[in-house]
Amino acid sequence: MSMTPREIVHELNRHIIGQDDAKRAVAIALRNRWRRMQLPEELRVEVTPKNILMIGPTGVGKTEIARRLAKLANAPFIKVEATKFTEVGYVGRDVESIIRDLADAAIKMLREQEMTRVRHRAEDAAEDRILDALLPPARMGFSNEEAPTQDSNTRQLFRKRLREGQLDDKEIEIEVAEMAGIEIATPPGMEEMTNQLQNLFANMGKGKKKARKLKVKEALKLVRDEEAGRLVNEEELKAKALEAVEQHGIVFIDEIDKVAKRGNVGGADVSREGVQRDLLPLIEGCTVNTKLGMVKTDHILFIASGAFHLSKPSDLVPELQGRLPIRVELKALSPQDFERILSEPHASLTEQYCALLKTEGLNIQFQPEGIKRLAEIAWQVNEKTENIGARRLHTLLERLLEEVSFSAGDLASAHDDKAIQIDAEYVNSHLGELAQNEDLSRYIL
């Protein structure tokens, strides 16, 4: 990650409106990963990541920051929900599976990078195998010395046609590696055993080939992936993945507030507190057994987030609070924020709806006053009913464009090239009455 904090924030600004404090915190945390790697070995070991706790109401951008961060990080990244885990001894997934999933993510990410690196060599090898199936090499005889030259010319001609896609629909018989994948259904919490069994069956079927009849296009893809897999050094890949997880891994734990203890202690709270206590060694630093080997979690960055509308950050066990030293509060959204969300981000909601309806030949245009009125209604409905943040915009837009989406084909032919204008009047006529009636808006919007 060689991007500076300012560049990271700038990239996040393309997709997320406001929440500058949260963006700055994750940008600094991400940059510190790079800074740490520049230090001498003896000092690098001592520098541990400063984990982050993001606090804010639902629908203000906590999860979206995680999603965008995953794309920027170019590091093993996993997002999990705290509610999916149970303490050791209860039926369900234990928290150590977070690190096992992170190891899987690292292997997948690095394998894709390696596959891309060897792609050209794999494509050449795959082409040769397809051409061998199309044109079996001629046997050498004493009578005809010109055969190799003619054969080479024919092969080059077929190679050209193959690259141009002229042979895509031709059917050939070719030997490809047998798919050794096998699905094993096991109860929650037994993922490690499942992985071991799958690896065992995969190794048993390794190297076996099977003749299959396929179209050239499908065969080329299969053979290319097979050749690329052969060029990738699995042992080297595992070693790199292990280092990537330990030194650059990022875990985003969502809904952390749902495992916080609430005022009245009930039976379920025992399990909640147990999950927190199981998370402690993971965040502090421990060793977890994965398919890559033993993974140390000392330098993995943990970012936790929660709405905390039924509980407070102080309801988390004190040790866990201490392991999340950086606190960031995300603010509730204002009507102006809603307006900006609808118009400013890259691939905004309004842009998405315009593009979707354009596929039917129907043009719609969102006018500034229409967007403003839509933002006001979203804010009003949130204030009157449950505040679900920017997610309210999805509900409103679906309701607003329901008739247009249903009759898009008919409207396209009726309007020719004229665009349907979504202005304040249009918004009021479709949503105004619903927004004013609290009972209706509670159930419909």
Curated annotation (Swiss-Prot):
Binding site for ATP: I17, G59, V60, G61, K62, T63, E64, D254, E319, R391
Pfam families assigned: AAA (PF00004), AAA_2 (PF07724)
Gene Ontology CC terms, in alphabetical order: HslUV protease complex
InterPro entries: AAA+_ATPase, ATP-dep_Clp_protease_ClpX, ATPase_AAA_core, Clp_ATPase_C, HslU, P-loop_NTPase
Location(s), subcellular: Cytoplasm
Main location group: cytoplasm
A single GO BP: protein unfolding
Entry GO MF terms: ATP binding; ATP hydrolysis activity; peptidase activity; proteasome-activating activity
Keywords assigned: ATP-binding, Chaperone, Cytoplasm, Nucleotide-binding, Stress response
UniProt-listed SUPFAM superfamilies: P-loop containing nucleoside triphosphate hydrolases
HAMAP family, per database record: HslU
Family: Belongs to the ClpX chaperone family. HslU subfamily.
The protein's assembly and partners: A double ring-shaped homohexamer of HslV is capped on each side by a ring-shaped HslU homohexamer. The assembly of the HslU/HslV complex is dependent on binding of ATP.
Function description: ATPase subunit of a proteasome-like degradation complex; this subunit has chaperone activity. The binding of ATP and its subsequent hydrolysis by HslU are essential for unfolding of protein substrates subsequently hydrolyzed by HslV. HslU recognizes the N-terminal part of its protein substrates and unfolds these before they are guided to HslV for hydrolysis.
The protein's name: ATP-dependent protease ATPase subunit HslU
Annotated organism of origin: Pseudomonas fluorescens (strain Pf0-1)
